[in-house]
Amino acid sequence: MATYTTSDFKPGLKFMQDGEPCVIIENEFVKPGKGQAFTRTRIRKLISGKVLDVNFKSGTSVEAADVMDLNLTYSYKDEAFWYFMHPETFEQYSADAKAVGDAEKWLLDQADCIVTLWNGAPITITPPNFVELEVVETDPGLKGDTAGTGGKPATLSTGAVVKVPLFVQIGEVIKVDTRSGEYVSRVK
């Protein structure tokens, strides 16, 4: 099995920690004035979803995680599972609610997603960075009502709620950044 040293650490690197695959969210090399250098990392356990701060001594080795990231197309959802299909082999993968997590509110039919597999089963779903969704419910923006922050909540066709500018109306299609859940622009 492959191993990584602390000099190989970068955001997105996947490795094994306590028998569970983890991904590095951010890392920083620290060389204190006194003592041994170390790498301060923030990691997310891919199965449990926990975010931890872990320090590794300089030169420490970790085992590479045997995970695969596949580009799959979201097909449909039934009572318990979301189904994804490989666009070339037409092989289907089913993911449970734990694997889908917050990505559920950004999944559209036929959307290309990144599905992370461990031991052949999906453990995380990453939706596209940007999605275009229709506004199904929002308050009407009143002319001249700009004294506040200039935003209002809007419910989208998938059930997600995002803050949008006052000029956005019901029925309009907007572009949303799925990583932050923020409004980007209107779609013409």
UniProtKB/Swiss-Prot annotation:
This is Elongation factor P. The keyword Cytoplasm applies. Pfam families: EFP, EFP_N, Elong-fact-P_C. It comes from Histophilus somni (strain 2336). The lineage of its organism: Bacteria, Pseudomonadati, Pseudomonadota, Gammaproteobacteria, Pasteurellales. Involved in peptide bond synthesis. Alleviates ribosome stalling that occurs when 3 or more consecutive Pro residues or the sequence PPG is present in a protein, possibly by augmenting the peptidyl transferase activity of the ribosome. Modification of Lys-34 is required for alleviation. GO terms for biological process: peptide biosynthetic process. SMART domains: EFP, Elong-fact-P_C. HAMAP family: EF_P. May be beta-lysylated on the epsilon-amino group of Lys-34 by the combined action of EpmA and EpmB, and then hydroxylated on the C5 position of the same residue by EpmC (if this protein is present). Lysylation is critical for the stimulatory effect of EF-P on peptide-bond formation. The lysylation moiety may extend toward the peptidyltransferase center and stabilize the terminal 3-CCA end of the tRNA. Hydroxylation of the C5 position on Lys-34 may allow additional potential stabilizing hydrogen-bond interactions with the P-tRNA. GO terms for molecular function: translation elongation factor activity. Pathway: Protein biosynthesis; polypeptide chain elongation. The modification N6-(3,6-diaminohexanoyl)-5-hydroxylysine is found at residue 34. It is found in: Cytoplasm. CDD domains: S1_EF-P_repeat_1, S1_EF-P_repeat_2.
